[in-house]
Amino acid sequence: MTVPKKHSVSLLVTDVDNTLFDWLAMWHTAFSGMMAEIVRISGIPQSELEPEVRRIHQRHGSVEYSFLIEEMPSLIAPGMTVKEVRARYDPAVEVYRSARLALLKPYPGVIDTLEAVRKRGCRIVAYTESLRYHTTERFKQLGFDGLIDYFYSPGDFALPSDRADLPARRAEAQASLAYTIHRTTPPGEMKPNPRLLLDLIRETGGDPARTVA
């Protein structure tokens, strides 16, 4: 895409993960800590757990699948209910959450740059392959709500059928952004994708000739 002159730019399209914040460091640190705690609680070597983890991540198409632990066969003892599995490994989940919150910060200069772009009258669209729930939660903590006009992402994975509390919690989280508008990308779409990029530019009222992406 041709980069227009600075004075004519009306739309900025940006990636999110590892562009606006260090997703890899956050996820790797949080996930490694969680796995270490799972090993401690279960007594099962990590090398035996990792193949199960990979299969579950592949099945759900995300390394941030929230219900990983309760689907790992090695962690479900005979006669153990899913609720009991959750309770036993809740300390591991807390390790993950604590590390994620501690590390989730914008790269230096990101907030100032987004604010400067908006002051020039330029709209900002973010496009990520991370799922909607996780991205919404991150936008709130990172301070992106209101700085970014739209964010495009896939939807969310299916919720466990035994968790009647989760649909309301997910709906609350999805509606919790005060200003930024979410739009869902079609299933299976991956980056780079020039056609999808053009679609989201047009959907947000942009002009490809006046867009930086």
Question: What do these predicted regions represent?
Answer:
Residues 2-52:
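Active-site neighborhood of HAD-like aspartate-dependent phosphohydrolases
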Residues 7-8, 66-67, 94-140, 194:
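Short, acidic loop-to-helix structural element flanking the phosphoryl-transfer center
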Residues 27-36, 65-73, 132, 136:
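An amphipathic alpha-helix signature
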Residues 33, 37, 112, 116, ...:
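Residue-level signal for well-ordered alpha-helical scaffold segments within enzymatic catalytic domains
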Residues 40, 54-98, 116:
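A metal-dependent, Asp-based hydrolase signature
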Residues 57, 98, 102, 185-189:
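Pocket-edge positions in alpha/beta enzyme catalytic cores
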Residues 125, 131-212:
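Substrate-recognition "cap/lid" segment bordering the active-site pocket of phosphatases
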